[in-house]
């Protein structure tokens, strides 16, 4: 278990402690810190013998499903299978397990399925699920574009929950960083994130703003060195800070002047919600999907066109220069996340009380 999807899962199961939840990991890669946070109602099904360690094998998936059917589900009167990943392997296994009810969560931009060599399999297996859970309205529209309008009535909208208690416990830790800064927290992956546009936008800020505000990147990933080199070539490296992966990103959000998410594609970027929860104003690329749904088309944060560094630079300048507009976004940030959480909990109850 690693990454944002697993964090979303943890937030959900922490709100359904009256249900027995079994996790079936397909690949044996865990984040030990997340495992330690699992509530008592959650257990991990050990499947070392059948777990996938490399190339997708249909036979492995069939054997794994048969193992679950013979050894696990007989212990329960009612068994609901929820696919909580966007990979074809987890979808196939979910459909092969015998259950009373089948659901599948969609975390990604649905157009990503079109680029998969397994797209024909997605089309076949998605038909078996009673409900598809999308994490915002924009994602639902995209899913129906890709797989057909017939899915519209099967789709349940469930926003991702933000763990406000955890954020509140961590955001006030002392941060040993003495300069004001603009922040982006993300995995260094150029396929979905757009660090270059943010660096270009920062370069276009007036000199006095760059002198006052550093640009800070929190995170790590396979493209870290490429992005760092781009920062060097931009001529702004002296104003840009790469912190690497941080155990507590919330104290960085709490102390940031503003938070920027520059992405090419998203599902439902929880990092925007986390920044808003610390009352940090947000600017995000208007990518599919999530940012527009969270920020309500500018009501709770500013949006810019994907890849448009001029627009981003102007909106950064606006927030850094206009105190009235800036303070308005500060005052409404937390309220928006509490509202989203309220919607999410209502949806979770609807899903799991069926």
Question: Model-derived features: where do they sit?
Answer:
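Conserved acidic donor-binding segment of nucleotide-sugar-dependent glycosyltransferases
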Residues: 296-298, 302-309, 318-323
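N-terminal strand-loop element at the rim of the active site
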Residues: 1-3, 7-11, 15, 19-59, ...
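Short hydrophobic beta-strand element within catalytic cores of glycosyltransferases
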Residues: 281-285
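A conserved mid-protein helix/loop that constitutes part of the nucleotide-sugar donor-binding site
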Residues: 3-11, 180, 184, 189-204, ...
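A charged, aromatic-enriched C-terminal amphipathic alpha-helix characteristic of glycosyltransferases
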Residues: 324-353
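A short, active-site helix/loop in glycosyltransferases that binds the activated sugar's phosphate group
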Residues: 91-93, 129-154, 162
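Short His-centered aromatic/hydrophobic patch
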Residues: 82-89, 106
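Aromatic "clamp/platform" in nucleotide-sugar-dependent glycosyltransferases that forms part
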Residues: 245, 264
């Amino acid at each position: 278990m690693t990454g944002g999807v697993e964090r979303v899962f943890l937030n959900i199961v922490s709100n359904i402690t009256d249900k027995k939840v079994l996790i079936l990991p397909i690949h044996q890669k865990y984040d030990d810190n997340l495992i330690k946070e699992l509530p008592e109602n959650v257990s991990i099904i050990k499947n070392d013998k059948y777990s996938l360690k490399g190339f997708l094998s249909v036979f492995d998936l069939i054997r794994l499903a048969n193992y679950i059917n013979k050894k696990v589900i007989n212990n329960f009167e009612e068994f609901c299978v929820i696919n909580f990943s966007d990979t074809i392997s987890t979808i196939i296994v979910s459909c092969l397990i015998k259950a009373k009810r089948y659901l599948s969560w969609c975390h990604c931009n649905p157009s990503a399925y079109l680029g998969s060599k397994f797209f024909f399999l997605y089309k076949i297996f998605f038909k078996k699920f009673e409900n598809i859970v999308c994490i915002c309205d924009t994602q639902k529209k995209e899913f129906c574009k890709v797989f057909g309008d017939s899915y519209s009535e099967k789709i349940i909208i469930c926003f991702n929950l933000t763990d406000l208690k955890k954020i509140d416990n961590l955001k006030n830790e002392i941060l040993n960083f003495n300069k004001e800064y603009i922040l982006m927290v993300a995995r260094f992956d150029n396929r979905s994130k757009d660090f270059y546009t943010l660096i270009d936008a920062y370069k276009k800020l007036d000199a006095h703003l760059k002198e006052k505000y550093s640009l800070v990147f929190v995170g790590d990933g396979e493209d870290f060195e490429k992005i760092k080199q781009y920062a060097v070539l931009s001529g702004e490296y002296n104003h840009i800070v790469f912190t690497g992966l941080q155990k507590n990103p919330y104290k960085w959000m709490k102390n940031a002047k503003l938070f920027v998410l520059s992405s090419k594609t998203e599902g439902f970027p929880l990092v925007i919600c986390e920044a808003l929860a610390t009352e940090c104003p947000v600017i995000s690329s208007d990518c599919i999907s999530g940012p527009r749904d969270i920020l309500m088309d500018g009501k709770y944060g500013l949006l810019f066109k994907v890849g448009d560094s001029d627009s981003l630079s102007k909106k950064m300048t606006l927030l850094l220069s206009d105190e009235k507009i800036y303070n308005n976004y500060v005052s409404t940030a937390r309220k928006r996340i509490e509202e989203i959480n309220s919607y999410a909990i209502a949806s979770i109850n609807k899903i799991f009380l069926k």
